[in-house]
């Protein structure tokens, strides 16, 4: 287990990504084609930036990435990658959405590797994680384009099945995935929604 964790940490450093979490998104991307060239991507809870950087590479120079976090991320997209705009805001505050919309009003993909500060209480941690996930889903309903894609990290426990059902109701296809690069002992999984059913006005 430790060897696997060390492998991904070392690989991230070698590949010039801030954190090993990039390989969780990479694994999901290879299997489900979440992000395409030219896409607009909103990354909630983006710090330290691995997912945003990887998403910018997938989207290419005609795409755009907006990363939001309470902690200020730094750096930009790599050569031949989409520009990255960093926003230091709380996703629970209206000012965050206003700041995002000043850059771009809508997105084709919403991604989130966000996690709460853990307490050690499994039930409490799971519920706090779910609260954040529901917040990302609410934001998706406001900014995601029709047929857009969504992926969000969540800790299993508590009302987790209800959250999965909520995603299923909003997307044509939804599933729960556990990347190989996730720590074996971790309760984290990712809920994936493909092809958002945007309500018709």
Swiss-Prot record:
Keyword Acetylation: no
Positions of S-adenosyl-L-methionine binding: 49, 51, 69, 90, 113
Compartment(s) of residence: Cytoplasm
MF GO annotations: rRNA (uridine-2'-O-)-methyltransferase activity
Catalytic reaction annotation: uridine(2552) in 23S rRNA + S-adenosyl-L-methionine = 2'-O-methyluridine(2552) in 23S rRNA + S-adenosyl-L-homocysteine + H(+)
EC primary class: transferase
InterPro entries reported for this sequence: RNA_methyltr_RlmE (IPR050082), RNA_MeTrfase_FtsJ_dom (IPR002877), rRNA-MeTfrase_E (IPR015507), SAM-dependent_MTases_sf (IPR029063)
Active site residues per record: 153
Record keywords: Cytoplasm, Methyltransferase, rRNA processing, S-adenosyl-L-methionine, Transferase
Pfam families xref list: FtsJ
Keyword presence, GTP-binding: no
Family of the protein in this entry: Belongs to the class I-like SAM-binding methyltransferase superfamily. RNA methyltransferase RlmE family.
Protein name stated in the entry: Ribosomal RNA large subunit methyltransferase E
Organism: Desulfotalea psychrophila (strain LSv54 / DSM 12343)
Name of the gene: rlmE
